[in-house]
Each structure stands twice: as structure tokens, then as C-alpha cells.
Amino acid sequence: MDFQPGELCAYYRLCRYLGIFCIDYNPTKKKFRLRRSVLCYIVHFALQAYLVGCISVMVTYWRRCFKSELTTTGNHFDRLVMVIALGILVVQNAWLIWLQAPHLRIVRQIEFYRRNHLANVRLLLPKRLLWLIIATNVVYMANFIKTCIFEWLTDASRLFVITSLGFPLRYLVTSFTMGTYFCMVHIVRLVLDWNQSQINAIIDESADLKMTSPNRLRLRVCLEMHDRLMLLCNDEISLVYGFIAWLSWMFASLDVTGVIYLTMVIQTKKSIVLKLITNVVWLSPTFMTCAASFMSNRVTIQANKTAKMLTKVPRTGTGLDRMIEKFLLKNLRQKPILTAYGFFALDKSTLFKLFTAIFTYMVILVQFKEMENSTKSINKF
């Protein structure tokens, strides 16, 4: 297959430099391939070794560098969030490097649809999103260094400071991974939209009996493309990125809870506006995860439009009717198109699950805090 590089090449290249996966565009053969370079694997295993080392240090010296402003519950929860963040990144990196072959098939199919059906469309979202990811990473890292290194860990050992730097790495790697997923889903949605425009044109011409035979062939091609796109989303994209999305949502619930809890417990002289800006920076990984779910939801809406469109087609008494009825019967009970590895659908309902998890964690933390305060009061007497 003769591919041309698209807007997502920058994402693939950056992910290769970060040791996430080895997919790259070969200009000589004009197609995407697995460029299994030694440097990519060195970066990958060096990052994995560093993260495992960070986890080991944090678990071994669990009570080291607890903040006096926090309760014991808050300190333990804060340390738990950091360890889980590092553990999730280790699993995420291993998952993506292991599934490079199916990932390459996804990339080739996405680029194939992009070249054949969206050649005249200028995609602005991937480039804008890339600059947004880079900017938020810089701000996030600067905020982490300012808050954690120069404020909370001023008295900590150098080893512990180096260990804590693994936390912002999770956002760096995950942001480019989810950014790639976001752009892939965006292209799938645009291809679905293009396919629906073709189906609309066929429906408009279906009244002309002379066009019945050619229209039947064209409609079959369009419906088969729809099925292939659904298969791409349901099986391959959900396989590679679904597990990553599930890990991201699981961490997002803990991360948001931690930020809210710290804001409630730690009293500072900062203005409300400054606190709000700081919290927005801390929660930028969660916003990226939520944005990916909204894009997935748009794909589901776009795909369901095809079935709704075909239900309104008047019957012609030809082979077109049987083809449409077969398609509608197969799509009558549409399963979730993009899922978090089968755990839940990636759509707007996921936000409700996130808020439910955050509320549950907050209730548990507050209860532990009250129990801790009660124990301290009893011990005073």
C-alpha cells in the first residue's frame, strides 16, 4: 500500500523518541513500518527502569517527606497517588510496546482512509492539539518543579527529589499517547461523515429506476466501509488504546480527588483566582482524558446517524431495500463503538462515572480525616 505522510506523523515521531512505540514513516517505501531502532528500545527500557526505581524508593521510604500541613490520611493518599501514577505508566509503556503490530495496522488504515477520502480536507486539529500538548507539558512541569521541588521537598534528599520527577513524566507520555488516539478518532469521524454524504447522494438518486443497479453497488461499498470503520474502532483501536483509556480514567479519579482534598486541607494565603489557576494546571491531564472521551462520543453519534438515515429511505421494491434492511438488522442494537477495553463505553456517560468515583473517594477521605481527628482528641485526654 502506497502511503503518504499525514498530520499524525509528528505524533508517531515524538512517541518513538519517547520510547513509547517504534512506528515511523519510511519515505523510500512510502509506507509506515516498525522501525525497531536500538535507541528507541534503550529509551524505553531506561524509562521503565527509572520508573520501577522510583516506585521502589517511594515504597521503601513511604513515610519520608510527609507534609506537616496535611493529616496522616492526606499524606498517605498523596503518596499512594504518586506510586499509582508511576505504576500506571510502567504498565502503559509495556502495553504499547507489546502491541506494536496491531498498532501499526491501525496507523496504516487511518492513513489509508485519510489519503483516499480526505485528501482535499485540511486537518487543523492535529497540529493545534500538538502545540497545546507541548505548551501544557511545559506549564505542568514548571508548576511541579515550583510547587513540589522548591516548596514541599526543600528538605528532602536528592535521591527523593529525583524520584519525584517520575510523576510529571506520566503526563508527558500519556498526553502524546492520548493525543495520538484523539487525532485518530477525529479522522475516523471525518471519514464516517464523508461516507454518509455518499450514502445521501445515493438515496437522492434511488428514485430513478435506471440508476438502481449502479446505486446498489455504490451503496454496498459505502455500507461495507461503515462496517470496516466500526470493526477498526471496536476491535483494533479499543484493543490498543482502550486499556490505556481505562488506566487514564482510573488515575484521573484519584488525581482529581487528591487536588480537591489538598485544596480543602492546606490553607494558604493565595487568592482564589491563583488557587483556581493552579488547580487547572494540576488537572490538565484529566482534561485531556475527558476531551478524548468527548471525541469518542462524537464518533458514536456520527455512526448512529447512518442507521437513522437509512431508516427514512423510501422502499423502491428493488435490491436496495434488502441491502438496507440487512444493514439495519445488524445495527439495530448498536454496541458501544469505542470502549475502555470493555470496562465501559468512552462517551459522555464516562464523566458521570468519573464524578461518582471522585465523590466516593472524597467521602472516604473525609471519614478517615474525621476518625483521625477524633483519635487525636481522645488521646489528649
Swiss-Prot record:
The annotated topology with respect to the bilayer is: Multi-pass membrane protein
Keywords tagged on the record: Cell membrane, Glycoprotein, Membrane, Receptor, Transducer, Transmembrane, Transmembrane helix
Tissue/organ expression: Expressed in the adult labellar chemosensory neurons. In larvae, is expressed in neurons of the terminal external chemosensory organ, as well as in the dorsal pharyngeal sense organ.
Where do glycans attach? N373
Q: What is the role of the protein in this entry?
A: Gustatory receptor which mediates acceptance or avoidance behavior, depending on its substrates. Plays a role in sustaining courtship behavior in males, possibly through the reception of a stimulating arrestant pheromone.
Which stretches are annotated as coiled coil? none
Q: Which domain of life is it from?
A: Eukaryota
For the Extracellular compartment, the record's topological domain ranges are 59-79, 151-171, 261-271, 372-381
Membrane-spanning ranges = 38-58, 80-100, 130-150, 172-192, 240-260, 272-292, 351-371
Q: Pfam families from the entry? A: 7tm_7 (PF08395)
Per the record, the gene is: Gr39a
Deletion consequences:
Leads to reduced courtship levels toward females.
The record's comment on protein family reads: Belongs to the insect chemoreceptor superfamily. Gustatory receptor (GR) family. Gr21a subfamily.
Subcellular localization is given as: Cell membrane
- Give a GO cellular-component term: axon
Q: What is this protein's name?
A: Gustatory and pheromone receptor 39a, isoform C
Q: Tell me, what is an example of a GO biological process annotation in this record?
A: monoatomic ion transmembrane transport
Q: What PANTHER family does this protein map onto?
A: GUSTATORY AND PHEROMONE RECEPTOR 32A-RELATED, INVERTEBRATE GUSTATORY RECEPTOR
| Membrane side Cytoplasmic: residue ranges | 1-37, 101-129, 193-239, 293-350
Q: MF terms per GO, please?
A: ligand-gated monoatomic ion channel activity; taste receptor activity
